[in-house]
Amino acid sequence: MNAPHMHDTAADGAAIEATVADIADTGRRALTRREQKEAYENNKLFKRIVRQVGQAIGDYNMIEQGDKVMVCLSGGKDSYAMLDVLLRLRERAPIDFDIVAVNLDQKQPGFPEHVLPEYLTQIGVPFHIENQDTYSIVKRLVPEGKTTCSLCSRLRRGILYRVAGELGATKIALGHHRDDILQTLLLNMFYGGKLKGMPPKLQSDDGKNVVIRPLAYVKETDLEKFAELREFPIIPCNLCGSQPNLKRAEMKALIRDWDKRFPGRVDNMFSALANVVPSHLMDTTQFPFASLRATGQADPQGDIAFDEEPCASGDDTAATRDGARPIAARPISIVQFDDL
């Protein structure tokens, strides 16, 4: 099934740029200097997010010719932004792919079930609402006052994998962003004893699906501003009554504090995920330390590698480009941005 071209969505995206650029209607007042600056910043934000999503898709070959991408839409800012940008990119991409939005209605009390169907119908996006009462299952199995997110996530994941097969989707798109990836890295380091993050592309647990995260390069603060600018009909994420994941909240606060007090630090952390040197870590499954012998030949990964450590210069910004994507990633994209 070929999804229709989203002319209304294109107009929505163009509306940002129109607002941003100028008021063409001569009958309306001119923008003040402050309004012009705000419009300029909004335009930069929109272009930056589109560019970063396109870059992530290109770097990891997330979307290919003929794909049917199942965009998982929760009603939160991240999934709305992901759908919005993917629709924009599809119009300009040199490949053809379909998009279908999917929401899992878990029957949480107070969930506004009309919001997403109305929104998706308005913008002309094919969608499927999957009704599954996982809320009752979670409430029955998890003690009162405990965090339900882990069990809820597992149940939701299994259902979405099944739905992807039923819809013929070749890719499952999730709305995790750069900060989610870094939070997961720190959680695994601090509480799991693992150097493990959240990959931008992976094979699903059942081996039948490919999961992609198109927002992998995008900062959460940018998504917050974008959602406010686009006025998405946000659905609260606390309807289930679950206690917040305090450890993840702690990591989120830590990252935001670092980003504010030490410019470049968080960008370098993110860049490090794409610049791994197994010979300088301690995992014997990733590097053959036991069989290592002197070869008599210079080794670029030997002691000389320590001569270029950036801590001597104090430069916290050299490892990234545009403050978002790792410079090690290949500079390719599924879309040209010259005229964005």
Swiss-Prot record:
Keywords: 4Fe-4S, ATP-binding, Cytoplasm, Iron, Iron-sulfur, Magnesium, Metal-binding, Nucleotide-binding, RNA-binding, Transferase, tRNA processing, tRNA-binding
Predominant place of localization: cytoplasm
Cofactors demanded by this protein: Mg(2+); [4Fe-4S] cluster
Its EC number(s): 2.8.1.-
Annotated Gene3D superfamilies: HUPs
Name this protein carries in UniProt: tRNA-cytidine(32) 2-sulfurtransferase
Alphabetized NCBIfam families for the sequence: PRK10696.1
Assembly notes: Homodimer.
Organism: Burkholderia ambifaria (strain MC40-6)
Sequence similarity: Belongs to the TtcA family.
HAMAP family given in the database record: TtcA (MF_01850)
Gene Ontology CC terms, in alphabetical order: cytoplasm
GO BP annotations listed: tRNA thio-modification
Catalyzed reactions per annotation: cytidine(32) in tRNA + S-sulfanyl-L-cysteinyl-[cysteine desulfurase] + AH2 + ATP = 2-thiocytidine(32) in tRNA + L-cysteinyl-[cysteine desulfurase] + A + AMP + diphosphate + H(+)
Pathway connected to this protein: tRNA modification
Lineage of producing organism: Bacteria, Pseudomonadati, Pseudomonadota, Betaproteobacteria, Burkholderiales
UniProt-listed Pfam families: ATP_bind_3
MF annotations from Gene Ontology: 4 iron, 4 sulfur cluster binding; ATP binding; magnesium ion binding; sulfurtransferase activity; tRNA binding
Motif (PP-loop motif): 74-79
